[in-house]
């Protein structure tokens, strides 16, 4: 399947401008067009163009809740699997990821992040699969900043091993 996308991305920039003794803040907004090919590679196809600053939407995403369909033994297994995986993930190669993840689901990131914790994992069983919605907290070794990433995954157990399949 050959899928391609084009996205328009609006972003804003705050600049602190100093001229002699005077300092002022200038707030500007721009829009760019980004082309994404079927493998996830991206390229800007339109230079940043001035635009108005969009208003915040009233949209409120529906909170995902546990349906109580995953027992405590399975929850502990998945917690252990995900903790192991997310400790390895930042520095793992594609070959190493293949033991934990179906091809291309999560790509190597090549960063020196130190795993901190799984935050609010929510597990729900659907047939022989478990859907997972969670946040993962890392410390970036270069900046010492906390890196927080959200993941929505589908796990499946083959034999005694869990694997991320979506």
What kind of feature is each model-predicted range?
Residues 17, 31, 45, 50-53, ...:
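Weak global preference for isoleucine
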């Amino acid at each position: 399947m050959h899928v391609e996308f084009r996205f328009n991305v609006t972003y804003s920039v705050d600049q602190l401008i100093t001229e002699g003794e005077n300092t002022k803040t200038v707030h500007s907004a721009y829009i760019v067009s980004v082309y994404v090919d079927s493998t996830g590679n991206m390229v800007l196809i339109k230079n940043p163009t001035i635009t108005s600053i969009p208003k915040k939407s009233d949209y409120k995403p529906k909170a995902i809740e546990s349906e109580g369909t995953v027992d405590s033994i399975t929850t502990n297994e998945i917690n252990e699997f995900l903790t192991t995986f997310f400790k390895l993930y930042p520095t793992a190669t594609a070959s190493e990821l293949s033991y934990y993840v179906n091809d291309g689901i999560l790509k190597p990131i090549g960063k020196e992040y130190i795993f901190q914790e799984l935050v609010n994992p929510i597990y729900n069983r659907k047939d022989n699969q478990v859907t997972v919605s969670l946040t993962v907290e890392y410390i970036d070794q270069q900046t010492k900043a906390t890196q927080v990433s959200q993941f929505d995954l589908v796990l499946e157990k083959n034999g005694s091993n869990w694997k991320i399949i979506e």
